[in-house]
């Protein structure tokens, strides 16, 4: 209770308190209210105050404003008053003035009256009108006076009027009077004036009438003259065509008389007859012109040589020798027209005059040659002698050739299976026109030669000595006559005696000489590097050791093959040294010429290089190819003839000049060599001294050839690449030394350097070879040391001012030398390059060569010495191949050496690592940041010595270590560029050299510089070895990626571990990056050497897998490699063959490219010839590849696999995957290679262009068409090039590289075209495997021989590609660092990617894109274009090869990827260009995604090529392609469509075709497209996606594809072989038909290649190529069995169809494309755009900065065509667009690159739609072909969106109408259009004159074929 109360109380209290508070609360509330009211009042008062203030303010303001108004008014009033006063004053003044005027008027009136009186008097005096006329002048004078007076009067009157107006009131009356008076006077004046004017008019009218009459008369006269000229030209064309057709008929009759083997005999006979005709005519006309001076000498030397080589001639190689004898001339003279068909085309188009003009000379020379031959015949079998005596030159030639062919056939049969013989020798022979002569013979010789070689080992010293004397003697001749040189070099190379015999023949017939040489070399090499793998495998295995033992002789012969006697031990070394020296001296003389007048040297170098190139190509190609392998040799040989003939004239002049210096040089070198030679002879096998001596001597010799090759390479000796590398080195070193000697050019040591340089150049080049040779004898360390010291000594001697340290000498010395050379070169060469992009081809080539070659040579040589030393055992044979790849020594030896050095050369490796370690070891370990100081050297050195490390080297070289991660794939790009440069060395290297100059100038130069150097090095090392180079390029890109990303780990892991895996495996793994190069080279050497290497390490497995891959890769890499690869491939099986094919293709591309720069250098106008030469060489290489491939039906797969395995690093693990993935990997590799393609692109472009030229004499860029017969391989090489270019774009992954590529593309537009040509060429070559290779060439040009050769892509990209994932990932890492998958994984991914068009293309495309992106730089743009085109081409081709459908998918994907890469890297290229490129790329991606699936239809591509040729077909093809592309890349395609106009149509077409595509293809394509699209935004992402996503698809597809490809290849082998012979023009058709889908693909590729070539600058070749393309197209469509007959029939049909379609497409193109053809199809008149192809359609073509962007599209749009090409084709990019852009091509490739680029692109399109044989594939391919044209257009579009647009449309239309035929037709059209350019015109005319009908038919046929399919 209490508690409650208390609570209540509390509550109450609370309430109380509450109440009280309430009261307070209430009060407070009131108070608050009060306060609030107060506040409100205050607020109101404040407001009132404010308002009042405001009012006051307003009032104040008003008042102030009023005051202001007042002031204003007052002011105004004052002013008015002032004005009033002024006006009054003025009035007064006016009044005064008026008075004055009145006075003046009076005076004027008086004057007028006087004048009137005078006039009256005058008129009266005039009397009659005649009198008046007579006095008209007086009257006129008077009239003028009157007019003046009147004027004055008028002025006065005006003044008066003014005054009067002013003073009107006061002066109105006076003014009126004055006015009246003036009016009267004016009237009188007017009347007089009218009278006077009437008289004057009468006079004028009469004068005008008279002038008009004169003009009419003059016009009529001019028209009559023009008509007469046209008629004359037409007559010549027709004559040449008749001649060609007669030859073809002869061949066909023979072939029909005899089947397979008889066929092969007959083919040989046919070749022989053609050789006789061409050799005697062409070679005589050109070579004999040169030789006339040295004829007696040559005869004497030949005779002498006969004596020396009688035994050899009588050796198994005798048959080959004789053909060689016959062929060399043909090779030399009709290098452009490698075959009669080629000759006819070329002659009819551009070289006709040569053939025609040379007919008398030919007959005379023929008799001389026949006399020579008779002399030789005395030693030769009686069969040869009697024909020579009895028959006329042509008949004698024919009988000789036939006899030789028969004997070769017999020997071949003995040495290798008839199929191998027929396929290889014949296919080689057939594939390249030269190849027809040299490759087939090569194979025969080679095949039979191993015994000779082995037997010769006993007398290498003897023979070499004799040969040496002969060489010395014959050196001049050799200079004059590549045959002689080839023979001379071949003699040392070919088992001394056999080689001698070959040499003898070579003297007579460079082609056959070195063909036989090559064959013997190859044979010897083959025995060592199994050329006929299966049967030669044991030989190879036993021969490998033998070769190892023989290494001094065989290895040396390989080296010597490359270098001449070098490879044959000391005797051979001496001989070759002499030859090489002689050659090199020639080269050096040329170089000196070059050095002396940088510009002239460019020409001289071009000519001299060409001469050397031809000669060295003959010799070096003969040797290099023999050395490196028949394929390579063929390749080389093909280029040799190609170059020989185009360069023959220049060559002839320069040969004399060079000969003089050459003799002197020869003496110097010989003395140096002899000083070392006796030692070499005595101590070659001894080891250290030998190394030193040999290095000095042999290296000098090899250096000569290599340097020359390199030199030549940059100057367009694609086939001389190996030699170019060696010769280039020697050339450059010697050039430097000679220059120092003659013109202390770069190096300080003039005399020592002369001697040492001669030594050193050769030593470095040879030393690696010798070390390779010695390597077997020596320890790696010893050799390394020996090499190190020898090279060091040499280098120190050479580079007295350079770093002397030996350890550094190798790395640093090399670097020093390289810096010296590179610095010299970069400073002088690069600067020169930079400043002489135009001069760059020759000068850049030269400087680059000097930079690259000299330094590279030193570098390479040095690294080579150590590298080879280290890797000699492996490289022993390979080095031989490497020897021709001496530059690639770094690559091959570098790769091998690097692993070897890494493993074996522990001490040296650091040195080498610094120098080659920078390249190889450092590359492996790291980009070799240490070398960065000597980076330029390192670049050169590393690329040179370690092509695998080349990327590292490249990046190391140019890039800083920090750049290594970036450089790896930059390096891959660079490496790719390097390799590509080598691949497209002539154009690319040259371009790239320039481009590297540019690159060096630019930040990209880090990459590009390595690129140039890498190009130089890659090109030098990998240059000729297309395999080696390719390998190197391959390796470098691969290594670069692997090495770049996992720098040491991947590279070393791959390089060292895999190197450990058997050095071949290392070659395979490092080969993925480094061994790839090695492998490539090994494929070349390891084909023989690979086995040797692998024998050394794991002969069987490396041989099969490692070696097979490596050698195959190398084979792929190099033609020579191809030969061994063939042998090797045969033993290795498909893989070897595949890789060989790849290598071969690579060499083809490489060679072509090498040749291309020469072409470029020579002149963009003669690109056709050169391209044809290059194409021929490439074709040879391709032929070798084709042979290799046909030999291995699964060769494409095998190659791919080998490439893939190399790529994968796990030969076995990837063996199957490789097989399946091999293709994709090749694609990947090609991509990296394509990445390598910055240079490779160019080279590829060049290759493509060359290929196209070979293929299409008519269409320089479409080489493959005419050269189809012998350019099938070329076409493949072409394809390879095409593919390579696209491959390059991947490498282009790094923006820099891409810029570089583009830069090169501008320069190597040829390269691009060549790449495409290579791509197309490759397919033609190996319809199945070659197709794959071609596709890889296209899609991953490097991936396949096509890639490696066409671009580094084939080998480089192949290596790259085969290390593509590795390399690609590395390349891709720049795009997406994370994408860098473990090399193996990445490789597998790449493989899978390769297998999955999407994945592979994505990877390839992206890297290609990157590459392209890199090339977007104006310098690289064409290359980039090339690269993209190539990348896509490789994709397309790879897919085509791998899986036509897949290719389709892959190609599109590659396109997309490339586009992505391009887009990603586009910023690198000029914004506009980049944008254009991006558009193009998108377009291309669309088209390519669609095209990818149609890649399988690459064969139809030739149709677009033809259309491109004609410039009217392309739009259609692109439309078709567009459809496919649309499916995958509708958006991109739409953009393209906007850009290309026909894009939509293409897209629709593509869609339709794509729908038709197999679902797998579609899926893959879609995936690829998706991936591509993904990658479009993030390149890396796309690649990553593609890698991860499409690997399986690609893998599956690849698996499927290889199988398809295998059978097609097998079919292709025989039928293609026959067809090639039968249809030199129809060469593409043969493989295509046989290959079926693959064949179609190949054919398309070929055609596309032709197109690309056309664009690139081989418009002429392209035209001819397209002629052949259309033929091949028809042929391809024809069943394999009926291939021979139907090839011709189809050819006619195709041509007919092409004519109709051509016209139709012409119309379409006229409306849609920029290129317009007359209905007659006479010529493609580029629309303003087309004319601007370089500028407009080919915006990126010239340098294709946008090319890089469209580079992927390039694949579709042929942008890859050259421009590096420009860049490349870089192109260095054969495509339909090529055809459409021939003018551009001619302009830009002629300006060289644009056309090439366009061509490269177009061939891709062409290729895509090409496969008409496979219905779905055909349509798809048509679509693909269309995208290619689109790409080409894109490429052009980069340059000129409008131009590009019409091109794709054109391509689309062609694809749609008759993709195959139309593509060829487009090519023809383009060629005709391209014909607008100088060479293109020539070839275009040929293609059009002879090929127009064919093209039209082909196009027409294409439509029916398409319908059929």
Swiss-Prot record:
Coiled coil feature spans: 71-253
Biased composition (Basic and acidic residues): 736-748, 1241-1250, 1547-1560, 1567-1576
Biased composition (Polar residues): 753-789, 950-965, 981-990, 1066-1084, 1300-1325, 1428-1446, 1869-1878
Gene Ontology process terms (BP): microtubule bundle formation; microtubule depolymerization
InterPro entries for the chain: NCKAP5_C, Nckap5l
Pfam families referenced in this protein's UniProt entry, alphabetically: NCKAP5
Description of how the protein assembles with itself and partners: Interacts with the SH3-containing region of the adapter protein NCK.
Designated name of the protein: Nck-associated protein 5
Organism: Homo sapiens
Lineage start: Eukaryota, Metazoa, Chordata, Craniata, Vertebrata
């Amino acid at each position: 209770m209490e508690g409650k109360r208390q609570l209540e109380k509390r509550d109450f209290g609370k309430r109380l308190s509450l109440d009280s508070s309430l009261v307070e609360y209430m009060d407070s509330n009131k108070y608050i209210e009060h306060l609030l009211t107060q506040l409100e009042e205050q607020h109101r008062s404040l407001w009132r105050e404010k308002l009042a203030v405001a009012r006051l303010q307003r009032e104040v303001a008003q008042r102030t404003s009023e005051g202001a108004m007042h002031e204003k008014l007052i002011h105004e009033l004052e002013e008015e008053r002032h004005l009033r006063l002024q006006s009054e004053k003025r009035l007064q003044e006016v009044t005064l003035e008026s008075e004055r005027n009145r006075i003046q008027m009076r005076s004027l009136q008086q004057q007028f009256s006087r004048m009137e009186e005078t006039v009256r008097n005058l008129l009266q005096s005039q009397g009659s009108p005649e009198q008046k006329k007579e006095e008209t002048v007086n009257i006129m004078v008077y009239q003028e006076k009157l007019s003046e007076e009147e004027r004055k009067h008028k002025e006065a009157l005006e003044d008066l009027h003014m005054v009067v107006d002013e003073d009107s009131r006061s002066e109105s009356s006076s003014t009126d009077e004055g006015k009246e008076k003036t009016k009267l006077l004016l009237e009188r004046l007017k009347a007089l004036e009218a009278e006077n004017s009437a008289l004057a008019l009468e006079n004028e009218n009469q004068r005008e009438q008279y002038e008009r009459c004169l003009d009419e008369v003059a016009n009529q006269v001019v028209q009559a003259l023009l008509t007469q000229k046209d008629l004359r030209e037409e007559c010549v064309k027709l004559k040449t065509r008749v001649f060609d057709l007669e030859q073809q008929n002869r061949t066909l009759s023979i072939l029909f008389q005899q089947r397979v083997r008889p066929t092969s005999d007959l083919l040989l006979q046919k070749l022989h007859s053609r050789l006789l005709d061409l050799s005697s005519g062409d070679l005589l006309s050109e070579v004999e012109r040169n030789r006339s001076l040295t004829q007696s000498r040559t005869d004497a030397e030949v005779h002498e040589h006969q004596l020396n080589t009688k035994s050899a001639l009588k050796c198994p190689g005798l048959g080959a020798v004789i053909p060689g004898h016959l062929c060399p001339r043909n090779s030399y003279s009709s290098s452009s027209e490698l075959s009669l068909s080629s000759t006819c085309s070329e002659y009819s188009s551009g070289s006709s005059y040569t053939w025609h003009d040379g007919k008398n000379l030919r007959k005379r020379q023929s008799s001389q040659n026949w006399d020579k031959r008779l002399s030789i015949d005395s030693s030769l079998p009686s069969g040869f002698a009697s024909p020579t005596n009895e028959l006329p030159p042509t008949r004698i030639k024919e009988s000789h050739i036939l006899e030789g062919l028969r004997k070769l056939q017999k020997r071949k049969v003995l040495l290798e299976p008839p199929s191998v013989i027929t396929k290889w020798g014949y296919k080689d022979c057939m594939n390249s026109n030269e190849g027809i002569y040299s490759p087939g013979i090569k194979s025969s010789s080679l095949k039979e030669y191993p015994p000779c070689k082995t037997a010769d080992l006993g007398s290498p010293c003897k023979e070499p000595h004799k040969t040496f004397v002969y060489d010395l003697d014959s050196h001049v001749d050799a200079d004059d006559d590549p045959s002689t040189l080839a023979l001379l070099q071949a003699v040392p190379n070919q088992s001394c005696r056999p080689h001698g015999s070959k040499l003898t023949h070579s003297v007579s017939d460079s082609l056959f000489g070195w063909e036989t040489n090559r064959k013997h070399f190859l044979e010897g090499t083959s025995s060592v590097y199994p050329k006929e793998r299966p049967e030669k495998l044991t030989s190879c295995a036993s021969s490998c050791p033998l070769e190892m033992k023989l290494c001094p002789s065989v290895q040396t012969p390989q080296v010597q093959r490359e270098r001449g006697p070098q490879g044959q031990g000391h005797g051979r070394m001496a001989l070759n040294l002499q030859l090489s020296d002689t050659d090199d001296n020639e080269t050096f003389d040329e170089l000196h010429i070059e050095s002396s007048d940088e510009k002239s040297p460019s020409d001289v170098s071009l000519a001299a290089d060409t001469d050397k190139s031809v000669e060295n190509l003959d010799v070096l190609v003969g040797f290099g190819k023999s050395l490196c392998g028949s394929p390579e040799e063929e390749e080389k040989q093909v280029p040799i003839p190609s170059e020989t003939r185009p360069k023959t004239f220049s060559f002839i002049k320069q040969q004399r000049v060079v000969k003089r210096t050459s003799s002197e040089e020869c003496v110097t070198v010989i003395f140096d060599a002899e000083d070392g030679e006796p030692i070499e002879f005595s101590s070659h096998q001894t080891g250290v001294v030998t190394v030193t001596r040999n290095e000095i001597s042999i290296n000098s010799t090899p250096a000569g050839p290599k340097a020359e090759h390199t030199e030549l390479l940059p100057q367009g000796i694609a086939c001389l690449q190996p030699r170019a590398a060696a010769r280039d080195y020697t050339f450059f070193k010697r050039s430097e030394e000679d220059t120092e000697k003659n013109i202390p050019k770069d190096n300080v040591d003039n005399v020592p350097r002369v001697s040492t340089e001669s030594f050193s150049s050769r030593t470095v080049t040879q030393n690696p070879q010798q070390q390779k040779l010695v390597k077997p004898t020596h320890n790696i360390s010893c050799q390394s040391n020996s090499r190190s010291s020898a090279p060091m000594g040499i280098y120190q001697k050479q580079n007295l001012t350079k770093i002397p340290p030996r350890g550094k000498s190798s790395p640093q010395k090399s670097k020093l030398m390289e810096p010296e050379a590179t610095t010299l070169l970069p400073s002088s060469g690069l600067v020169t390059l930079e400043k002489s992009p135009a001069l760059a081809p020759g000068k850049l080539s030269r400087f680059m060569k000097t930079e690259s070659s000299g330094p590279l040579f030193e570098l390479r040589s040095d690294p080579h010495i150590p590298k080879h030393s280290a890797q000699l055992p492996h490289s022993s044979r390979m080095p031989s191949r490497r020897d021709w790849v001496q530059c690639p020594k770094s690559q091959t030896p570098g790769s091998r050496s690097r692993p070897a050095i890494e493993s074996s050369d522990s001490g040296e490796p650091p040195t080498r690592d610094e120098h080659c370690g920078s390249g190889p070891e450092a590359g492996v370990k790291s980009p070799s940041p240490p070398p960065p100081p000597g980076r330029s050297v390192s670049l050169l050195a590393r690329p040179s010595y370690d092509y695998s490390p080349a990327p590292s080297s490249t990046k190391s070289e140019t890039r800083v270590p920090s750049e290594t991660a970036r450089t790896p794939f930059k390096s891959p790009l660079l490496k790719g560029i390097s390799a590509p440069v080598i691949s497209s060395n002539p154009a690319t290297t040259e371009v790239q050299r320039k481009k590297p100059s540019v690159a060096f100038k630019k930040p990209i130069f880090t990459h590009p510089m390595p690129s140039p150097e890498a190009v130089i090095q890659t090109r030098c090392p990998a240059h000729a070895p297309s395999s080696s180079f390719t390998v190197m390029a391959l390796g470098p890109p691969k290594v670069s990626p692997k090495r770049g990303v996992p720098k040491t780990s991947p590279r070393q892991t791959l390089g060292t571990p895999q190197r450990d895996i058997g050095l071949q495996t290392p070659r395979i793994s490092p080969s993925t990056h480094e061994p790839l190069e090695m492998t490539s080279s090994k494929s070349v050497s390891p084909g023989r050497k690979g086995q040797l290497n692998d024998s050394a390490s794991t002969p069987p497995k490396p041989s099969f897998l490692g070696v097979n891959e490596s050698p195959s890769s190398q084979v792929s890499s190099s033609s020579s490699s191809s030969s061994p690869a063939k042998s090797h491939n045969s033993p290795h099986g498909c893989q070897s063959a595949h890789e060989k094919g790849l290598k071969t293709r690579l060499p083809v591309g490489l060679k072509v490219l090498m040749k291309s720069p020469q072409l470029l250098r020579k002149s963009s106008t003669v690109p056709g010839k050169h391209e044809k030469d290059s194409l021929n060489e490439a074709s040879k290489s391709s032929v070798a590849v084709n042979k290799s491939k046909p030999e291995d039906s699964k060769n494409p797969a095998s190659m791919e696999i080998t490439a893939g395995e190399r790529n994968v690093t796990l030969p076995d693990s990837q063996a199957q995957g490789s097989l399946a993935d091999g293709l994709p990997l090749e694609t990947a590799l090609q991509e990296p290679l394509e990445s390598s393609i910055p240079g490779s692109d160019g080279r590829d472009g060049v290759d493509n262009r060359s290929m196209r030229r070979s293929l299409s004499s008519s269409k320089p860029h479409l080489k493959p068409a005419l050269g189809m017969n012998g350019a099938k391989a070329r076409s493949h090489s072409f394809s390879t090039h095409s593919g390579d270019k696209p491959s390059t774009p991947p490498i282009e992954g790094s923006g820099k590289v891409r810029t570089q590529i583009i830069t090169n593309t501008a320069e190597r537009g040829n390269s691009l075209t060549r790449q495409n040509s290579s791509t197309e060429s490759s397919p033609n070559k190996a319809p199945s495997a070659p197709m794959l290779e071609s596709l890889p060439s296209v899609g991953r040009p490097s991936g396949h021989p096509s890639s490696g050769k066409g671009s580094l892509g084939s080998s480089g990209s192949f290596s790259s590609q085969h290390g593509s994932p590795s390399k690609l990932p590395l390349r891709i890492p720049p795009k997406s660092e994370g994408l860098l998958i473990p090399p193996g994984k990445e490789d597998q991914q790449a493989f899978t990617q390769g297998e999955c068009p999407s994945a592979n293309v994505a990877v390839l495309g992206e890297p290609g894109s990157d590459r392209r992106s890199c090339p977007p730089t104006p310098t690289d743009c064409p290359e980039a274009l090339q690269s993209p085109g190539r990348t896509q081409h490789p994709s397309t081709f790879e897919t085509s090869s791998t899986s036509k459908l897949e290719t389709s998918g892959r190609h599109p994907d590659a396109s997309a990827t490339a586009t992505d890469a391009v887009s990603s890297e586009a910023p690198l290229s000029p914004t506009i260009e980049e944008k254009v490129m991006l558009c193009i790329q998108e377009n291309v991606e669309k088209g390519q995604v669609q095209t990818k699936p149609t890649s399988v239809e690459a064969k139809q591509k030739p149709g677009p090529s033809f259309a491109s040729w004609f410039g009217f077909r392309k739009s259609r093809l692109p439309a078709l392609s567009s459809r496919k592309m649309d499916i995958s890349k509708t958006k991109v395609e739409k953009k393209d469509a906007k850009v290309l106009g026909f894009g939509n149509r293409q897209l629709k077409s593509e869609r339709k075709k794509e729908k038709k595509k197999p679902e797998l293809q579609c899926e893959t394509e879609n995936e690829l497209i998706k991936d591509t699209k993904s990658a479009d935004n993030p390149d890396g992402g796309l690649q990553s996606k593609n890698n991860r996503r499409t690997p399986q698809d690609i893998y599956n597809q690849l698996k499927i594809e290889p199988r398809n490809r295998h059978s097609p290849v097998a079919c292709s082998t025989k039928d293609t072989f026959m067809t090639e012979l039968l249809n030199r023009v129809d060469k593409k058709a043969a493989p295509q038909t046989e290959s079926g889908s693959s064949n179609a693909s190949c054919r398309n590729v070929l055609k596309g290649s032709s197109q690309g070539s056309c664009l690139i600058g081989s418009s002429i070749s392209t035209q001819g190529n397209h002629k052949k393309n259309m033929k091949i197209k028809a042929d391809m469509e024809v069943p394999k069995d009926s291939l021979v007959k139907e090839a011709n029939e189809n050819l006619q049909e195709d041509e007919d169809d092409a004519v109709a379609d051509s016209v139709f497409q012409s119309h379409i193109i006229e409306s849609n494309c920029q290129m317009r053809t007359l209905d007659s199809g006479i010529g493609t008149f580029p629309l303003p755009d087309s004319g601007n192809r370089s500028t407009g359609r080919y915006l990126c073509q010239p340098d294709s900065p946008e090319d890089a962007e469209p580079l992927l599209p390039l694949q579709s749009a042929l942008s890859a065509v050259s421009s590096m090409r420009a860049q490349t084709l870089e192109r260095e990019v054969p495509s339909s667009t090529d055809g459409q852009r021939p003018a551009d091509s001619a302009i830009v490739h002629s300006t060289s690159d644009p056309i090439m680029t366009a061509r490269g692109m177009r061939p891709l399109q062409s290729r895509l739609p090409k496969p008409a044989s496979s219905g779905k594939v055909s349509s798809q391919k048509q679509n693909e072909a269309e995208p290619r044209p689109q790409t080409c257009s894109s490429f052009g579009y980069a340059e000129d969106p409008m131009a590009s647009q019409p091109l794709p449309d054109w391509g689309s239309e062609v694809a749609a109408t008759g993709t195959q035929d139309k593509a060829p037709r487009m090519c023809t059209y383009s060629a005709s259009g391209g014909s607008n350019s100088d060479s293109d015109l020539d070839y275009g005319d040929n293609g059009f004159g002879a090929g127009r009908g064919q093209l039209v038919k082909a196009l027409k046929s294409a439509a029916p074929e398409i319908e059929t399919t």
